């Protein structure tokens, strides 16, 4: 396999069967045991192909899990009791819930850091056992200076980066010095809102082995169908990411010019936009007036969706008028017509 191929090409070819007489695509292998080994320990050919592919894209050793949140559990399983973890104050609600629960149970201590405060992250790197980064953050799309933080943490704290929003097409955190990358493949990697699956990618094989052991102990193994669906989604990630990025950039620019919109956050690439209205009532009314864009949770699918995260349990810190917009593959002009009519209805 070409070592100089782009990430977009690798997303299509990595992990596929090789050799005469092999199928063009990886088959679904619904096996609970392979010879003398349980598949929950060693995986199935379907998992292995997905892990090989994502590992190639991220530049490390991948392990598939039953869900994105299961990857958080596996990382926590690596920490001794009483460990200190630095986490962003704005991040995925499920991740924060996991850390909050572990802290309440006395398993670890959490230091909550403002995402863009690089100085605070650098200080934490000298004291914490693990730094959990998310860039862009969910749902506010704040950016974290990964290279500066990994440089400060080198030889001290382990650095984990949730790369769900950026995907390997947008950034490869292991190349920036991170130790572990995690993904909710439920989102952009799968891309069709039809699966639950998570992935870790470790820079070192020893660390990957520890994560695989955590998966086995916790029983957080993915189904064969889910692994196959995630691999199928990965094959089109390049074109989906590029198209969604083009549409999102256009829509972010237009949203920024609309009188009803008070703030727009867009990191320059990717499918996610965060924008704010003057208050929760206006945001709720906008959601009610949408015709094409789905008012729904989750993100990263071929269909566009929008949600007011502050209305959801655990996200009260998010501005009350903020809306998280996942841009899909519909015609961007149709998406804008839908947004514009909903925004205009607020007058």
Task: Give the label of every model feature segment.
Residues 49, 53-57, 63, 70-71:
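Glycine-rich loop-to-alpha-helix module at the N-terminal edge of alpha/beta enzyme cores
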Residues 14, 30-34, 66, 308-310, ...:
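Pocket-edge structural micro-motifs
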Residues 2-3, 13, 17, 62-260, ...:
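Conserved PLP-enzyme active-site core in the AAT-like
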Residues 29-31, 35-37, 248-249, 265-274:
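Conserved glycine-rich beta-strand-loop-beta hairpin in the small C-terminal domain of fold type I
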Residues 8, 122, 146, 240, ...:
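PLP-dependent enzyme catalytic core of the Aspartate aminotransferase-like
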């Amino acid at each position: 396999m070409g070592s100089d191929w782009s990430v977009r090409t690798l997303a299509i070819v990595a992990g596929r069967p090789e050799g005469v007489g092999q199928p063009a695509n990886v088959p679904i292998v619904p096996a609970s045991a392979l010879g003398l080994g349980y598949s929950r320990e060693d995986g199935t050919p379907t998992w292995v192909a997905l892990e090989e592919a994502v590992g190639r894209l991220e530049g490390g050793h991948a392990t598939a899990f039953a869900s994105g949140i299961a990857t958080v559990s596996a990382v926590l399983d690596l920490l001794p009791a009483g460990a200190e973890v630095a986490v962003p104050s704005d991040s995925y609600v499920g991740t924060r819930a996991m850390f909050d629960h572990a802290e309440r149970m006395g398993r670890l201590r959490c230091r909550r850091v403002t995402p863009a405060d690089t100085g605070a992250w650098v200080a934490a790197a000298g004291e914490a056992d693990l730094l959990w980064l998310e860039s862009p953050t969910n749902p506010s799309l704040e950016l974290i200076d990964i290279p500066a933080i990994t440089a400060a943490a080198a030889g001290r704290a382990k650095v984990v980066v949730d790369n769900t929003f950026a995907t390997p097409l947008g950034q490869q955190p292991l190349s920036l010095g991170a130790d572990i990358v995690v993904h909710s493949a439920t989102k952009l990697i799968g891309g069709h809102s039809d699966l639950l699956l998570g992935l870790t990618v470790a820079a070192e094989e020893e660390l990957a082995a520890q994560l695989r052991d955590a998966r086995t102990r916790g029983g957080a193994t993915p189904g064969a169908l889910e692994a196959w669906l995630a691999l199928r989604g990965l094959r089109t990630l390049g074109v989906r990411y590029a198209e969604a990025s083009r549409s999102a950039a256009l829509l972010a620019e237009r949203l920024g010019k609309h009188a009803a919109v008070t703030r727009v956050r867009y990191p320059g690439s990717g499918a996610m936009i965060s924008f704010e209205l003057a208050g929760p009532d206006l945001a709720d009314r906008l959601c009610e007036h949408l015709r094409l864009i789905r008012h729904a949770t989750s993100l990263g699918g071929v269909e566009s969706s929008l949600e007011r995260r502050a209305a959801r349990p655990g996200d009260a810190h998010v501005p009350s008028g903020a809306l998280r917009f996942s841009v899909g593959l519909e015609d961007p002009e149709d998406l804008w017509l839908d947004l514009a009519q909903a925004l205009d209805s607020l007058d």
